Amino acid sequence: YFIINDGVMWQTILNILEKKAKEGVDVRLIYDGFGCLTTLPYKYYEEMRKRGIKCQVFNPFRPILNIIQNNRDHRKICVIDGWTGFTGGINLADEYINQRKRFGHWKDTAVMLKGEGVWNMTAMFLYMWGIVTNTDTSSDFANYVPHRWHPDDFEGSGYVQPFCDSPLDDEV
């Protein structure tokens, strides 16, 4: 997520993430180092890890002149179980649910996706996880491939394939 800020929204989500981590669910979180520069404490990832949540910072802010500082990850990807995912423009802060009136009335959009298309969201997240942890995540990909097929759950014959670009591809 680009912005996470303590408040009603984040505490509600954090409580669920912590509960699921305690139940043995693999809970992972990536937040942007610049987007959360003024909203989260320094080394907030350590607090998350104490709660059982695997947490990494994408491109931590370093106060030096560097073109890479502008490479930011604004994506908001939430994968629940490999079958249900969410994406959209909503950051995890109270102003995005009008609990706090920072920008006036805020209206944003997010979508819930169910089905095999969520695998692409999972792959996008795991790819970025490998980058921020500097680890080989190939075994993670095998562990998170959806193992169920629910053809009766959907009407129509459409096709959904989420896709992405990387904030690290050096495009200007």
Features from the language model and the residues they span:
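Charged, low-complexity intrinsically disordered terminal segments
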Residues: 1-172
